[in-house]
Regions:
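Conserved beta-strand signature within the Rossmann-like core of class I S-adenosyl-L-methionine
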Residues: 148-156
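A short glycine-rich, Lys/Arg-flanked "PGG" loop and its adjoining helix->strand segment in the class I
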Residues: 135-147
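Conserved class I S-adenosyl-L-methionine
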Residues: 56-63
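Conserved Class I S-adenosyl-L-methionine-dependent methyltransferase catalytic core
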Residues: 1-50, 54
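Conserved SAM-binding loop of SAM-dependent methyltransferases across substrates and taxa
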Residues: 66-77
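Conserved SAM-binding strand-loop segment of SAM-dependent methyltransferases
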Residues: 100-110
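A short acidic, Gly/Pro-enriched loop at the edge of an enzyme's catalytic core
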Residues: 111-120
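Substrate-binding/catalytic lobe of Class I Rossmann-like enzymes that use SAM or dcSAM, i.e.
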Residues: 157-187
Length: 187
């Protein structure tokens, strides 16, 4: 709850000013984009193509933010998406953004998710999880993913394994979080 309040439940108008029109919070794919909106659409489409998303597939998005990816996957690929976030503000706006689509945005901790999904998508949440919780996070993915399912992880990565985050980053950007290394995620 603390992370949700400090990091995500801030002024909606500020967030709208900082992000693209879909309120995508993570980096985009600028390889063929001329503006932020196009870069975010290109990133979301790349994720959908990489996981082979098809109509009717059930998708779990961990750390769904304002529902931007969930909306895109449902509108463009016909997926049925369940997104979870620990931000009440994100749930409220996400439900509004995804109204009328086969999307459910839940106020729920990733550790409490149940069900089985064709795809599990994780875009920009590992930075918030913290190294002490990587194993539990990966167990959640394993528990909720069908045997023939595909999981997708998009995160900022570090070259060095750290257990204490940068004080400035921890205070102003990722409360209780840190940048994961491949070694930490592989344990």
């Amino acid at each position: 709850d603390e992370v949700g309040r400090k990091h995500n439940d801030i002024d909606k108008d500020l967030n709208r000013a900082m992000h693209d029109s879909r309120m995508v919070y993570t980096c985009g794919d600028r390889s063929h984009a001329d503006c932020l909106d196009d870069a975010q659409i290109a990133k979301m489409d790349l994720v959908c193509r990489k996981v082979g998303l098809r109509p009717g597939m059930k998708v779990l998005e961990l750390g769904c933010g304002w529902g931007s990816f969930a909306r895109y996957a449902a509108e463009t690929y016909g997926a049925e998406v369940t997104g979870v976030t620990i931000s009440k503000e994100q749930v409220e706006l996400g439900c509004e953004i995804c109204k009328g689509l086969p999307v459910e945005i839940r106020y729920q901790d990733y550790r409490e998710v149940s069900g089985v999904y064709d795809r599990v998508i994780s875009i920009g949440i590992l930075e918030h999880v913290g190294y002490k919780n990587y194993r539990v996070y990966m167990k959640t993915v394993d528990r909720t993913l069908k045997d023939d399912g595909i999981a997708f992880f998009h995160t900022i990565g570090g070259n060095v394994s750290i257990v204490i985050g940068n004080p400035w980053t921890t205070r102003y950007i990722f409360p209780n979080g840190q940048i994961p290394s491949i070694a930490q995620l592989g344990k």
